[in-house]
């Protein structure tokens, strides 16, 4: 259990915490009873008394099977995690002296990644004197962009960051395949 999660109080822990609870037992309206009486009702039914709203006044306790409740909570958490979309960013590196056939080969891979819905970071590595005149690197990035612009969107303009010229491209929304 992580630190963020609050511990759910059950059975005797509720009796130790408070004298009275608002009891929800599935049979009609919630009613305010002594916590020991609520625990007795739960035990008579062969179930647990679970504190579902500790901050209410009085706290709300429900008669239920704690194991089943815990299982349902885990199931909901897993379902929520499945629905989260994790964006994967692939990185393709170039140099400013790259040959035409190498560009074509890398562009083919970029298009494959974009078709799968992945984001692609294009990086041109500049060495030594190339840093003084990064125009060649921008030419390479722009050439690659011209080749993939039909299947991608620019997230930003190419920019020089340290020894690299970076450009992040994402798939055009309607062109994504799974």
Swiss-Prot record:
Coiled coil location: none
Keywords annotated in UniProt: Cytoplasm, Initiation factor, Protein biosynthesis
Main subcellular localisation: cytoplasm
Highest taxon of the lineage: Bacteria
InterPro entries: T_IF-3_C_sf, T_IF-3_N_sf, Translation_initiation_fac3_CS, Translation_initiation_fac_3, Translation_initiation_fac_3_C, Translation_initiation_fac_3_N
Record's subunit section: Monomer.
Family membership noted in the UniProt record: Belongs to the IF-3 family.
HAMAP family: IF_3
Subcellular localization(s) per the UniProt record: Cytoplasm
GO molecular function per UniProt: ribosome binding; translation initiation factor activity
Cellular component aspect of the GO annotation: cytosol; membrane
Function of the molecule: IF-3 binds to the 30S ribosomal subunit and shifts the equilibrium between 70S ribosomes and their 50S and 30S subunits in favor of the free subunits, thus enhancing the availability of 30S subunits on which protein synthesis initiation begins.
Descriptive protein name: Translation initiation factor IF-3
Biological processes annotated in GO: ribosome disassembly
Translocase in keyword set: no
